[in-house]
Structures are given as C-alpha cells and as structure tokens.
Swiss-Prot record:
Function: Required during spermiogenesis to participate in the repression transposable elements and prevent their mobilization, which is essential for the germline integrity. Probably acts via the piRNA metabolic process, which mediates the repression of transposable elements during meiosis by forming complexes composed of piRNAs and Piwi proteins and govern the methylation and subsequent repression of transposons.
Name of the protein in question: Tudor domain-containing protein 5
Extent of Polar residues compositional bias: 254-274
GO cellular component: chromatoid body; pi-body
UniProt-listed GO biological process terms: P granule organization; spermatid development; transposable element silencing by piRNA-mediated DNA methylation
This protein's encoding gene: tdrd5
Ranges of residues in domain HTH OST-type: 6-79, 122-197, 378-452
Lineage: Eukaryota, Metazoa, Chordata, Craniata, Vertebrata
Amino acid sequence: MEQERIMQRIQKDVRALLIASKNGLSIHELEQDYRMMIGSHIPIRSLGYKSTMELLLDMPSVVKIHTQLDGTVKLSAVVDETTRRIADLVSCQKDRCTARTRNRRRNIRPRCPVDLVRRGRVSPVLPATVKSDLRDLLSVSPLLLSELEKAFSSRFGRSFQYTRYGFYSMLEVLRSITDIVEVKQTRAGSLLVLRNSETGRISASLCVKQSQLAIDPKKTSCVLEQCLKEPRTPEKKTSETVTYLKVSPPEPQKLSSKESPSVTRSTSPLINSSNKEQRLKLNVLLDESLKSNENKAPPVTNFTSAVPSHNSVLSNSLVGNSVSSETLFTKMSRPTSHVEADHSAASEPDASVLEWLEKKLEKELKLCLARKGAGGSVSDALRMDIQHVVNQHSDGLKISQLPTVFKSFTGKDLPFKELGFMSVMELVGSLGDILCVESTVDGKDWKLFDAKKKDLVDEFSAGLPSTSSILSSWNSSQQTTTPVKPVGTIFSKVDEKLWWGPLELKLCSTEQIDIPPDAVRNQKLHCLPSMKRGFMIGVYVENIESPSQFYVRCCGKDTSEKLEDMMIEMRHCYSNECVSERYIVTDNCISVGQIYALRVPGDVWWYRVIVHDIKNSELLDVFYPDFGNVATVKKSWLRFLKNCYMKIPAQAVPSSLPYVTSTEDQWSAQAIKKFQQLCSCIPLVGMVLQYVQDILHIFLCDTSSEEDLYLHQLLISQGLAKMEPEHACKKISKKRNPFMQYLTPSQEQPQEESSQLSVPSESSQSEIPCAKEVKDEDDLGMPYLEAFPSGSDVWDENWAFSDGACDYDTAPTIPKVDTQKQQENKVSQETQPFKFCIDSADASVVHHPLEEFYISLIKSRKSQESTDIQQSPPTEEQHVAEISHRSATEQLQGGSSSSMLCEKKLYYEKEDLPYCQQSKCSFSPLLGFQRLQIPRSATPVALGPAARLATAGRLLYWASEPR
C-alpha cells in the first residue's frame, strides 16, 4: 500500500512538470525540475527500479517517450480530459527558445580553452628562438603564407602557436619580423621571402662556377677573368652570409728560398689588402707557378690544396669573407689531377696535426651552429657595438654592467627585449661566436671576453706545433694510423646543456655527475620493532632455505599494506624516463651496504635492495630487505633511492622454527620441499617465542582449512624432523645473520629491551611469571588477530610465557589463590599433568558477535573477582574439581552493560602414563602445560585462533560426551 501511494504521488508530480513544459523535457531536466519542486530526488530505489527511464516506462498513462534524430530522448505528458485545458493554455505561450539558446551559447566554454595573453600598450615580440626557426625555414626556399604553418609543423615537429606570445593574428607576427622577412604579393598569394638574399645569390653562383671547374679544369683562367670583370656589390656581413669553410693544417711561418714571393703572399692567411682584384690576379699567378713546377718538389701549398674541394662545409659562419674567398679560389684554380696526385703522395699526419685539426673543426662548427641559432637574429651593427664595448675591458666586462656600459658608449639602451630575448644573459649566450663567458672568482657573476682574443691567448699559452714537425710528418712516406675522436661542441658556456655531438663525450667530459638532493646516501634501514613473547601475528614466509632458516613478513595495515603502497609509488615514479635517467647510479657511487632501487628487466615492480658484494665491473650481489632474497644483478639496473622511501622499515625478519631439528646433520631435501609447500603463497598465524641473536623463533600454524595444521607437528609426524629435547640456544647464537649488519635497530623499541628479549636469563627459565599487561595493537603497528572478554572467567587468563626458554623437567604451576582447598591440592597439581573441562553456557545467551568472546590463552587481564574452586573426590582415573559460578561484566559501546553467567566445571584427570612418556607422545613444544577441555556443545567460532593454536598443541581438545 505504501508503494502504491508513492507511485500515485510521483505520477501526479511528473504529469504536472511535463504539462507545464511546452517543448517537453529530457530525463536530466525532469530529474532537475523534480528536485527543485519537491526538494528531493525521485525515489526510484524505494520503488524497486534501477533508473529513471525504467520508472517512466512503467507509466505509459502519464509519459510519452519520443526519440529524436540525434538519439536524444524527449518526454511529454499524456493529456486527458482533466488536463486538456491546461495543456492548451501552455501551447499558446510565447516561444522564447531563441533567446534561451543564445544565452546558453554565450555561457558555454570550450573543452580546451585557449586564453590569449592580454597585453598592454607594449607590442609583443617574437622570441629569438622562434625567429631563428623561421629564418631557417625560409632560407631553404620562399613560402606562401597559406603553407607556412604546414611547413613549420613538418620541419620542427610542432605547430606555430603565435597566440602564446601575445599576437592576435598572423599579420601582427609578420609586422614584428619585418627585419628578416619580406612579404611579396604574387598571383598565388602572399609570398614570404627572406630579406638580404644577395649573399645567397652570390654563394649560389659560386657553387655553379665550382661545379663547372670540376668538369673542365682548363677553363680556370677564363672563369677567374670573368669573375674579375663582374661588378661586385660591397659585401654586407648579414645573418644570411653563406661561405665555404675549409679545414686545413696551420700555415707555415717560414718558407724556403726556392719558393717565389708570390706563393708566400698568396698562402699567408693574414693578408689584409683592400684591392680584391689584385688578390685574384695573385691567385692566377699562383696557378701558373704551380703548373710550371709540376716535376719539382711540391710547394708548401700542397697541404692547403690537398683537401678535396667537395670536402668543404657549406654553412653559416663568421669567418671573414675575404679569407674564405681566397682559399676557395685557390682550391678551384688547382687542377683535379694534381690534387689527386699530391693527395696520394701525402702520408698520414701525426697526432699533433690531428689534434690541431680537431680543435679547428670544433671551432668552425661552433661558429657555424651558433650563427644558425638564435644569435642569427642579431644584426651585424649591434654585434660590432657589443664586441667593441667588450674589447675596451681587457680584464673582462661583467654581464650585469653590460647594459650600462653599452648605453654610455652608444647612447641607447641594449635592445635585447626587442630582439626576442628574455634577459641579457640569454642574449650573450646566443653570441657565442664573438663573445666568451667565464665565471668570476666569487661565482656570483659572469665576465665577457672577446672570443678571438681569448682563442689567441689560449693557443699562445698552449703552444702550436713547430713548422718543421708539421712538414716532415705531412710529406713523409711512412703511413701511420691515428684514431680520430668524434667532436662534440657546447654552443654556449652559459648553458652547457646545449650539446652537439656524441653523448659518450659529454658523459666522459663531466668530471662530477650531479647526484639528486633527495637521493639516499650513507643511510641504513630500520628493523621492525621486536615483538613480545607470546604475541600472535599473521605472517608470510619468504626465502625458505630450511625450517631453521627462513624469513617472515608480517601482515597488516602498517606493514604489508604500506609496503604495497610504497612499491606502487616507486613504480609510478621510476617508470618516468626523465626520473630514471636522473637517478642513474654511476660506478663510483656504488658501495657495499648502500641501499638503492632496482628493477629487473621483465618485471614491472621496483624494489629496495642493499649491495652485499661487488663481483666485477658489471655484476654485483644485492639483498632484498623486504623479502630476504639474495640475487645477482647488473649495475646498470640500479637507481638512487629517494629519501621518502626510507620511512617504512625492512619487512623481512630472519626466523627459525623452534623445538625441531633435522633427523640428520643437515636438513634433507624432502623436509625442505615439504616445508616450502606448507608455506607457499598463504598467510600463516605465527606465535612469537623469543629472539636469539636477532633471529625470531616463531611457531607457525595454517588456519586456512577446517583443521589447523601446525608445521612443526606435521614435520615430526612425517619423520622429516625430530623433537629437540632442549632448545639449542648456544648453537644458534653462533649463526648470526650476515645481512643484519646493514640494518639498524628500530626507533620504537630501545636496544636494552631488545637485548633482554633476545638473550633469556637463567632465572627466567625455572619459573613462568604472570603477565599483567597486554600489548596494544597500535604500539607495534600490527593487526591484532583476536579479542578477549574483560572478565577473567577461565583458568589461564593470568598465565603467560616467561621471558626465558621453557624447562621440560619442571611443570608450570597455577597462580596462587587465597583458598584453603587450592592449598590442599597444590602438591597434586604440581606433580601431575591435568586436563580441564569447561561447559559453556547456551549459545542463545550471547547477544553479541561470537568473535567478541574469543578465549585468549596467551595474554589477558588480571581477574577482578575472586573465585571459589571446589574439587570433587578423586577417582582412580581422574581428579575432578568443580568451579562455582562466576559473573563477568562486559562493557558495551552504547554505555549499557550486560552480564552472562557461565557455568564451568573443572576436571583433573590423572594419567596412567608417566610424564616422560607423555612427552614422547605429544608433539607440542609447550610440554608440561595444563590441558584444557572444551565440550562439543560449545560454539567453535568463539574459540578463535588462540584456542585453535592451543588445540593443536595438545593443551586444548574436545571432551568426550557424558554417557
């Protein structure tokens, strides 16, 4: 009835909303209008529907569903006789959909908004790097304006986003680069041409003439005469000057007397004559002299012309055009046959010449590539002014003083912003061909020097090879091979990351590699805090070598879950190529005992590892502190570990199974294999016994099946191990874990306490004191596996393990109670093993989950109420004692309390077998302790893992039903 009433109300509201809408509503609009009118959502869940559409399909008398062409759904109301008049009035309303649509379109923002940079009165400037890209693009060939963006994207791999720099249109961009780009109107459209193309035309004509000379060398003189007659415009040192760079050994300073003075004048690279025609005539005379002396000794110019003409490099350069023209025409005037003959006669140069060639090539490439970059946008006039200002300061000019000195020299500001540079440092860095930058003594500023003068000083200080050694090595008949190193160039000394050349040279040249500031250096991981005796914890068994030597990893929010989260973060971090390259560990940073991050190829996870041994230059042994494994890996797989991944302590704890030993001198392969099968891929319940020399002795129990399996008991029952009569502490103390030296004790537990737990005293072995405190779950950061009631309604709630090892010859005693009957039966209790039987109350009395009434056999609170123990007369087979009723108060969450009376009977059973024979039959390590019987009427779930642990240890078992 309630659902029918709700359904009728919803139909009424939906009909009202749809009738009021002239053009219908979508499902989303209907839900929104319903929420605005009623104040709550449509109760589809309470009516048993999964969606609003499913609800509307069940209301055909109220809603019409229309599917439009674009796939959207529109809802309209079904009009009946009672609502027809209202529907007619709504249909006569004035349609305002146009205004609504217009307003909506104004408010709609694009998914990927592009906000233009709002500027003030200052006109935007295109950055120098972008100018350099445009100049490089147009230097190949002119482009139409419509094809500019496509060509820019195909050449540089990115789009030309001029709006990022403050421009609103391409017209503004072209206006800002009128100094390098010229727009010409053609029939095809606006054509973008690079300005100052005369130099390009001259270089092109030179290339054509050179190719003609290579085909017909006899026409050399005619071509030279034609070049002399051609009118030559004065050369302008612009950014688009294209010349031929020639790599040659150094020119000799002294010549023999047999050589003509014309040869001396023509081969000197320091000729400074204003008459260019005279220099060309000298080159013609040089060619004639070379032809006349074919059979004579080769002149000194052989090593100048020995380099073939096709090996010259075509690139932008700042080398003087006059010197380049001279060397070019000198090469062109030499016939090809003579060049080949001299080249075959010449021998390999020595190491000094090759070193000079390497430096020369490096310098030439640096000049060419620097001019090709952002520095090409700087005009020659500004270059000369900056160079002149720097030359006035022989000791160097500070970069911070350059704008002031430049203004005092030229009377105007340094226009670095107008050229597209963000700072003076960026401008100076682009002028690496004319300026040299060095750091000051204090390291707070930079000094500028003239690059040419600096190179001359360096060459003079380093010393050039002598002329005689060069000539003798060049003209000698002996053939020697000298390996030539690849050349790498740093474009700017300000930013040394601008590297051109093989990456190996850059890595070798860097003497000191930067180590990330958050990299872990000379630190140790912390161990997990030591657990008290009798503490129960879930564990994973790792790296099993034998039942006496394995590792355990604790389960819990503060241990295994945090480790998984850390590994996920490490995978996300180190999977980035930039981060992985930054944290690469070099050979000089690898040392034994240091912790690093490691990923083996084929695996997706990163692990924390500690270097244990370095085998050779490539391989090393590492220890996994979180899993206990040892593996051999390559050095290249290591990465520096970030400091944030050192918070979690090492998770692997070296452990051993107590009270069991191998049947022979060593553990058999069958026993090790069986132990590995029992521990594989499943969490186990572990109970801490003690620590001996940092090795945890722990009992392991498999509770995944219906019947609990205790590993030490199973190994002994199958004959794979034997019970140890005494715990071999002395033997184990000699076997220290070698990997514990790489870890440091936990900060949560002082070292004094851990030492007391690891080495038990002799006095503690004779008696077992009562535990009065229970370790809190949050102290160790471990999940507490069981709960127990606050009342002390079982005999063993004040009983706990001692800090020392158990003595098999002495049976533990029950805590003293101030009753007369207990004192009378004290002798029989100390000399005979007992069995206890407890009859639990009916399960219907329990008002809370059964897990809250777990029985703790390990730790509990002290009893708050006294108990009266009544003992029945002993029979021949067993001693029976009955315990009176006791009440235990349980605190509830809401503040209310409820009491439950548990009637329990305590029976003492006398065994026929002596105690020594009973120890042989029992496989539990806790020998000599009292046994507790539970009737089968009790609920097994209420026992918990602690009681199940005692059951397998023959301390707790089911009592036989009374007949």
